[in-house]
Amino acid sequence: IGAGTGGLPSSNPGFYSNTYFFEAFRSWTGIAIDYDSDWYFSVKNSRNCKCVCEDLLEKNINEILSENECPELIDYISIDVDDAQWKVFHDLNFSKYKFNVLTLEHNLFQTLESCTQNRSEEHKQKVLKEYDAYREVLSSHGYKILWADVNLDGYGPVEDWWVSQEIFDRYADIYSESNNFKEAFNVISR
């Protein structure tokens, strides 16, 4: 979800896409959703997955998943939809849809930087409370945080990586032996 380029023009259909790797190198299938019509028209013929152009501030994520016949057990979901991030997260029916692996972009570093520059300490504490709340929701649905506050190319923290209890139990030894999240995630995603 949020398979676009983050507002950056690109001729590369995988530019800034968490899911493109799995499609291109693991032969995974799925659905890519983004509100950017420029993204949609630039990648709809170059991606193997189904590409959907929808504004997730306007349309409920569960409707889109249902309309596109997504299974109730989804191997991987990446939620990176900027302004619609928290709406999608709160709308998502965790009772119906289960995920083996979930990445949720939070861009906490940008949010806190903005709070420091433009907002009060009270606003910063409100943001941190919301951030903790989404982690509590995922934990309450049985997800385990694999890596918190993952940094991306010197930016960070940008996202958290979560796994289902089953995946966590299956790969706990890899996780505990490695601080290299890319190595462990590569094993998990095979």
Give each language-model segment a name.
Residues 1-62, 108-110:
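SAM cofactor-binding core of SAM-dependent methyltransferases
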Residues 12-21, 26-29, 49, 72-79, ...:
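Conserved acidic-Pro-Pro-aromatic motif
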Residues 42-43, 65, 88-92:
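Hydrophobic packing residues within well-ordered alpha-helices of enzyme cores
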Residues 62-63, 82:
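A Trp-anchored, charged/polar loop motif used as the substrate-binding/catalytic surface
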Residues 64-70:
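Conserved amphipathic alpha-helix within the SDR
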